[in-house]
Amino acid sequence: MTKKRHLFTSESVTEGHPDKICDQISDSILDAILAKDANARVACETTVTTGLVLVAGEITTSTYVDIPKIVRETIQGIGYTRAKYGFDAETCAVLTSIDEQSADIAMGVDQALEAREGQMTDAEIEAIGAGDQGLMFGFACNETQELMPLPISLAHKLARRLTEVRKDDTLSYLRPDGKTQVTVEYDENGKPVRVDTIVISTQHHPDVTWEEIDRDLKEHVIKAVVPAELMDGETKFFINPTGRFVIGGPQGDAGLTGRKIIVDTYGGYARHGGGAFSGKDATKVDRSAAYAARYVAKNIVAAGLADKAEVQLAYAIGVAQPVSISVDTLGTGKVSEDVLVELVRNNFDLRPAGIIKMLDLRRPIYKQTAAYGHFGRTDVDLTWERTDKAATLKEQAGL
């Protein structure tokens, strides 16, 4: 069956979006704890609304961190520093409700999970079960240099650029909240050929005109990010299409940790298991196994074994080995998917403790992932973005 030209859309949000504020607070708390106690168990959820931050969750640690201080520093770093923005780091109320991890959950995970993954025997790694059941997906494709789908790649770059021009005062009238969306046209062979539509909504000072925002964003944001050859006379631009976006951030919408899971991953281009990332330490397979699945998929594509690869992992609580591993190359594989699954089993340790060891996940590295995507990042060195297994996979596949 001949494929038709089609459109695909992905969105991103800035670090000042209410849900992303929550992700960054949760991961800032996680990082602060991991910096002092690498073996801490953290499941930290945040919600924000007008003038209020609530931090709740289960944390088991030997250290102390000043959660209200971390919350205020995070909000200040994002740029909510004045009451007229509708949310202010100094004056917002911060409530906390923290318990320890359930003993029933800990029983299935504990065994030998100390800071000695480097010296652990295979039997000890095998003894450490997953912290929950669940399924996780990882994806990679050769549409971009970072092996990510083009729509989400461009949406993230636009969102990041919105923040840059706000913080460096290029467009000093911008305020922290904002969203971007990119629609890409694909040809009959499934290759991206042009950008069809760009949508940007950004919070702004009440006195700036829509015409000024429209002109400035096209010049300083879109032109700076989207390659000229991808845009043409038919490309459509919707800049603040409601005409006004003054009330934003937590004053405009309540926010919650883990509510931007598609923004965090592949923009809807690949499937998602449903688990969120932020605020969770690496014993939570929602996070660590999703990172591992991306690592596997990226190395498969980097090795030239497929143009696209979607990897699914699934776990049972308290059990170390994945209950299933599957690879779907969407018809682009150079070897069979059975061969790819065998290569994955032979070259990647996908047990929870094995993932932590393989990707070195007991470090305070998570706040930097909490805005602009966890995958395809070129601005920070993330272990799951490395392609150090590609040569081995290619050789073992006989290519």
From Swiss-Prot:
CDD domains: S-AdoMet_synt. Residues 101-111 are annotated as: Flexible loop. ATP binds at H17, D177, G178, K179, R244, F245, D253, R259, K260, A276, K280. Pathway: Amino-acid biosynthesis; S-adenosyl-L-methionine biosynthesis; S-adenosyl-L-methionine from L-methionine: step 1/1. GO terms for cellular component: cytoplasm. Belongs to the AdoMet synthase family. This is S-adenosylmethionine synthase.
